[in-house]
Regions:
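Adenine-nucleotide phosphate-binding core of ATP-dependent small-molecule kinases
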Residues: 266, 273-277, 284-319
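Catalytic phosphate/nucleotide-handling subdomain of diverse soluble enzymes
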Residues: 219, 225-260, 266, 330-361
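Internal helix-turn-beta structural module
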Residues: 299, 303-319, 324, 333-399
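Phosphate/pyrophosphate-binding loops at sites that engage ATP/ADP/AMP, CoA/4′-phosphopantetheine
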Residues: 70-85, 191-198, 313-324
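Glycine-rich beta-strand-to-loop/alpha-helix junction loops that act as flexible
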Residues: 9, 90-93, 209, 323, ...
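Short beta-strand-loop/turn "lid" adjacent to the catalytic site in phosphate-handling enzymes
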Residues: 71, 75-123, 144, 151-159
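Glycine-rich phosphate-binding loop of actin/hexokinase-like ATP-binding domains
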Residues: 151-255
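N-terminal glycine/serine-rich phosphate-binding loop of ATP-dependent small-molecule kinases
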Residues: 1-96
Length: 399
């Protein structure tokens, strides 16, 4: 079975085509700048070479259509006929209370995703455009939605509710949903395989640290708690997002800066985090470089960033009554060695000891970076959200 995985954003489409017989990647790439000037597709060839092709893409339908053309291309493609694609799996950011597991797309699913656009206006609208484009270009091909927050749906009410009048949850569904769920799901299962743990009797803390970041407490294979909230703004300090903040600080600043709600939302999402503290960049590689060169704001941002991660590790260890393993994943977590070390520093009393020599060498590969006598294992696991989506798609379509 061949499964195409799509992640359709507001102006982009990332894709991977899998042969599910052996889970090999047949083709992958991404479309950028849909609806804008200078739109293009980047294709990664099987030999690792990357090819960029400029192409006018006014909307998602043309974006998906051009992905199909590239898949069929004799030089850079991987198939001879679109009928070779048995199913399409989509990443969908917000499933709300409606979707607690992956589903085959039908009209009611499309309607449900549209209803949830209030909670994720940019993301869900992009996903819908992708779903409808595939339906238009490949009618009758089964499509599956895998929801980013579905893995977090096992959170108990005392963990996901906010301490505001209960009727606001009932009426407006205001609660903690969490995000990066497909990543947390993959790495929490994979770390148990690496360490030989029984997932149904395990206490895992997963740290998905990229430009956006979140931590999850996974108890016996199910999420007990996670750091992101109603939106991806809560929790850790991030590239350009503030993370946890006193709600009164927000209303105070709105008054002082004469900001409207959407302006404040943009401010907290796009101009805060390490970018806001340093004024340099939202990219942690730039921040680490500046810190090493003596930039005091960059050094402060790193301390703040690592301190938040450490606080969540401590909090979730308490919430689960202990921890067996801590996982670092995503771009920053997989590649920035100092951040991993400093986030676990002074946690020896919890049984967490980093092997500095091993940790310093590990970038983007599976590895245990704790010492042999560390009671808690610290592990780097590169995430693979696409294979989770492909597996769910195959399973649902096959059944």
């Amino acid at each position: 079975m061949k499964v195409l995985v799509l992640n359709c954003g507001s102006s982009s489409i990332k894709y991977k085509l899998y042969n599910m017989d052996d889970e090999s990647v047949l083709a992958q790439g991404g479309v950028e700048r849909i609806g804008l000037d200078n739109a293009f597709i980047k294709v990664k060839l099987p030999n690792g070479e990357k090819k960029q092709i400029m192409h006018d893409m006014p909307d998602h339908k043309e974006g998906v259509n051009f992905v199909f053309k590239c898949l069929l291309d004799p030089e850079i493609g991987a198939i001879k006929d679109l009928k070779e694609i048995d199913a399409v799996g989509h990443r969908v950011v917000q499933g709300g209370d409606k979707f607690k597991e992956s589903v085959i797309v039908d009209q009611s699913v499309e309607d449900g995703i549209e209803e949830l656009c209030d909670l994720a206006p940019v993301h869900n609208a992009g996903h819908l455009k992708g779903i409808r484009a595939v339906d238009s270009l490949m009618p009758g091909t089964p499509q599956v939605c895998v929801f980013d927050n579905a893995f977090h749906s096992t959170m108990p009410d005392y963990a996901y509710l906010y301490a505001i009048p209960y009727e606001l949850y009932e009426k407006y569904h205001v609660r903690r949903y969490g995000f990066h769920g497909t990543s947390h799901r993959y790495v929490s299962k994979r770390v148990c395989e690496i360490l030989g743990l029984d997932q149904n009797n395990s206490k895992i803390i997963t740290c998905h640290i990229g430009n956006g970041g979140s931590v999850a407490a996974v108890l016996n294979g199910k999420v007990l708690d996670t750091s992101m909230g109603l939106t991806p703004l809560a929790g850790l300090m991030m590239g350009s997002r503030c993370g946890d903040i006193d709600a009164s600080a927000v209303t105070y600043l709105m008054d002082k800066l004469n900001m409207k709600p959407q302006e404040m939302a943009d401010f907290l999402n796009k101009k805060s985090g390490v970018l806001g503290i340093t004024g340099i960049s939202s990219d942690m590689r730039d921040i680490e470089k500046a810190a090493n060169e003596g930039n005091e704001k960059a050094q402060l941002a790193l301390r703040m960033y690592e301190y938040r991660i450490k606080k969540y590790i401590g909090a979730y260890t308490a919430a689960m009554g202990g921890v067996d393993a801590i996982v670092f994943t995503a771009g920053v977590g997989e590649n920035q060695t100092d951040l991993r070390e400093d986030s676990c520093k002074n946690l020896e009393y919890l049984g967490i000891k980093i092997n500095k020599e091993v940790n310093d060498k590990v970038r983007g590969e599976e590895a245990i970076i704790s010492t042999d006598d560390s009671k808690v294992k610290v592990v780097v696991v590169p995430t693979d959200e696409e294979i989770v989506i492909a597996r769910d798609t195959m399973e649902l379509v096959a059944n």
